[in-house]
């Protein structure tokens, strides 16, 4: 049976997990079905982390963009802050596409937008990750459009990461086959 793959992306109020919180997390199957989980208030973070942990249990492989350097350490830190077990994230087979691009391709730049341009993957032009902290402050003040903007940004990142994953699949077949054998 093929490994069940999920693309993961998170939205946060800071690049540092001791200074910020998780405000949203997106999951998308390799078939393209997406789901967005959000914290409408900072006090919702613990339940968001629990919900995300539970959702990830049904997948064999996590695929991220720069997840090894950001998403997973951020999630690990926030889980531990709330007394939750980080091991489900840490034990999951993980393919970081940013690492794959850096080690297997020879591109001028290796950030997601450039890789999407290289593979002619269309992206929505909207808020960027750096806009999330400001948007979240607006959302906390009741601005529903700001909350929706964060959601749309996350889902766009997921769609782009999924498309890059499909392009790079020949380069990660061995990791997928290994995960298949483990499931």
Outline where the language-model segments fall.
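Conserved RNase H-like, two-metal-ion catalytic cores of nucleic-acid enzymes
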Residues: 1-58
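Hydrophobic "anchor" residues on beta-strands that sit immediately upstream
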Residues: 5, 61, 92
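Metal-dependent phosphoesterase core characteristic of DEDDh/y 3'-5' exonuclease domains
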Residues: 20-35, 67-169, 174-178
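Conserved short-loop catalytic and cofactor-binding motifs
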Residues: 40, 63, 149
């Amino acid at each position: 049976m093929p490994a069940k793959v999920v693309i993961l992306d998170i939205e946060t109020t800071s690049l540092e997990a001791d200074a910020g919180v998780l405000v949203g997390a997106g999951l998308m199957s390799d078939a393209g079905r997406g789901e967005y989980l959000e914290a409408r208030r900072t006090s919702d973070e613990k339940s968001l982390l629990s919900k995300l942990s539970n959702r990830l249990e049904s997948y064999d492989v996590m695929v991220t963009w720069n997840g090894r350097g950001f998403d997973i350490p951020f999630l690990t830190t926030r889980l531990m802050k709330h007394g939750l077990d980080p091991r489900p994230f840490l034990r999951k087979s993980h393919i970081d596409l940013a690492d794959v691009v850096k080690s297997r391709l020879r591109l001028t730049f290796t950030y997601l937008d450039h890789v999407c341009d290289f593979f002619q993957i269309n992206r929505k032009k909207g808020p960027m990750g750096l806009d999330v902290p400001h948007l979240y402050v607006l959302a906390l003040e009741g601005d529903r459009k700001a909350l929706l903007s964060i959601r749309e940004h996350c889902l766009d990142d997921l769609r782009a990461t999924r498309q890059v994953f499909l392009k790079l699949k020949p380069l990660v077949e061995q990791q997928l086959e290994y995960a298949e054998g483990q499931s």
